[in-house]
Amino acid sequence: MKRLFSNVINLTLVLIVGVALSGCTVSNASIGSSSPWSLVDLDTEANPLDVDFVDDKNGFLVGTNRLILETNDGGITWKERNLDIPSEGNFRLISVDFKGQEGWIAGQPGLILHTTDGGKNWTRLDLGNKLPGDPYLITTIDTDIAELATTAGAIYKTTDAGTNWEAIVVDTSGSGGIRELRRTNNGGYISVSSLGNFFSVLRPGEEIWSPHQRASSKRVQSVGEQPNGDLWMLSRGAEIRFNADPDDIDSWSKPIIPIVNGYNYQDLVWDPSKSIWAAGGNGTLLVSNDEGKTWEKDPVGESVPTNFIRILFLDDLNSESPKGFVFGERGNLLRWQG
């Protein structure tokens, strides 16, 4: 009788899981035999959050707990760089961006740094309480010109090296506050609301965010651009979706669930060979070489005891080889070797 009762319970669980995953594409990902990634020793417990390069060799990495590191060998090794940051503040440096010798760093709370000589010297700008929200993303446009996005969904532009900031977005109510924000290739923005219950789009030239509903009842983790400009979405429950209709931003594919391990995905990106990478909790780093149909676990990512929070491939810097990084917690960083 106990065995019969146990079998009934097991069958019921199977049916529940089957119903829950109906309509989803689920893959049992195996571990790959090799990896294009290598682990970088940052010698820090801070979380790396962003990186950019002045040229092929010289670059800066920023992160939590006032983390600023500099490399002179293309990202193989990094050393601490001390800049003019108030000693009493535990700043979260969240964004760094260069265009030639012109560069910016944005941090929370209320910190902006600017350089015009490739990072040799930096000027600290005091934002005070001028802008709603804290700095979240900064983009170098040209000499003395930059765009700054804040945690309130406000977008500002400076044309005089940060002395004055002009509002691009007049009404931020459509953003719902943000948990994540990205700049698109054409100069627009995509944001996910602070609660993950919708996402918003700001197209170039617009002054108001356009909100869009999530694809299911599950909260949105992240939304970004595919190489062709269509969108992708990551939702709770480790679900991946792609735009089903290029002419309809609210049309989504059925969810893809590469593996079921209890951890959500935090980021999705295409590498230079157009393979798709997904990153998430507990060392989750997956790759698909067939447009998301099947997935494979990366062996290096699998061996690192961290939560991966971001994957970044940098634009062409006239580099000898593409530059890519996977950001993990507690000082973990992977570097692309190709």
UniProtKB/Swiss-Prot annotation:
Principal location class: membrane
GO cellular component assignments: photosystem II; plasma membrane-derived thylakoid membrane; thylakoid lumen
Keyword Signal: yes
Signal peptide: 1-23
Entry-linked Pfam families: PSII_BNR
Its biological purpose: A factor required for optimal assembly of photosystem II (PSII), acting in the early stages of PSII assembly. Also plays a role in replacement of photodamaged D1 (psbA). Assists YidC in synthesis of chlorophyll-binding proteins.
UniProt note: domains: A 7-bladed beta-propeller torus, about 55 by 55 Angstroms, with a depth of about 25 Angstroms and a central pore.
Protein name (database record): Photosystem II assembly lipoprotein Ycf48
Organism, scientific name: Prochlorococcus marinus (strain NATL2A)
